[in-house]
Amino acid sequence: MKKNHWIAASALACMLALAPSSVEAENKVDNKRPPVAERNFTSKAVEQLIKEVSKAIQDPKLREMFQNCYPNTLDTTVKFQMNGKKPDTFVITGDIDAMWLRDSSAQLWPYLVLMEGDKELQTLIAGLINR
């Protein structure tokens, strides 16, 4: 694991692990991610980080919240395609199918530390830059 990746994962895991826990059954968070076949984009590096960080989060509710929230942009708001040989990434940044440069960049920022080992993620980010 690369240093930046490890630092980001460790910081996030510590933050979530130290947060107050709740054991109330009615507060349980279910997996809200779309089925794999219905996700807009899947990154092997993101999925691996979710597994690693989830092991460090003791509170089940916080663990499931992380598992649902961290990949949400890739799961639901990214539209990726190739225009010829050029990648093209559209990121829905609101309640309508519109893309704002600042917002779309901010939505993909948490995944930048994972790019080095994930060619598909690199191509997705290149598509955003091309936009």
Question: What are the residue ranges of the model-derived segments?
Answer:
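Low-complexity, Ser/Thr/Pro/Gly-enriched N-terminal "stalk/linker" regions
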Residues: 26-99
